[in-house]
Amino acid sequence: MSRTENIEQIEESVEAEFKQPSMYKVILNNDDYTPMDFVIEILQLFFKKDEQQATEIMLAIHHKGKGICGIYPFGIAETKVAQVNQFARQNQHPLLCSLEEA
């Protein structure tokens, strides 16, 4: 095997080992008790949405039962879900944040 062929095989092997991480949707679920303003605050604080984006997502949550806050690799999505759920409980709201594979 020539040196060039060997290098090409190594490059192909390395490329095959690197996969894009699985992505996950972070979702806010509607409930009858959490104020709309609090949902907007969550979207701005944890997902860096501007007021217009946050309002659009909040209305989707209100009308459709859930809304996508963002799509992230698993570790980031899991952390955001935990942060949002903890913040909601600290503020005595039943808001539920969850994740699902994108």
UniProtKB/Swiss-Prot annotation:
Quaternary structure note: Binds to the N-terminal domain of the chaperone ClpA.
UniProt family annotation: Belongs to the ClpS family.
Organism per entry: Shewanella halifaxensis (strain HAW-EB4)
InterPro entries: ClpS (IPR022935), ClpS_core (IPR003769), Ribosomal_bL12_C/ClpS-like (IPR014719)
Gene3D superfamilies cross-referenced by the UniProt entry: 3.30.1390.10
Name of this protein: ATP-dependent Clp protease adapter protein ClpS
Transmembrane segments annotated in the record for this chain: none
Stretch forming the signal peptide: none
Function: Involved in the modulation of the specificity of the ClpAP-mediated ATP-dependent protein degradation.
GO BP terms: protein catabolic process; proteolysis
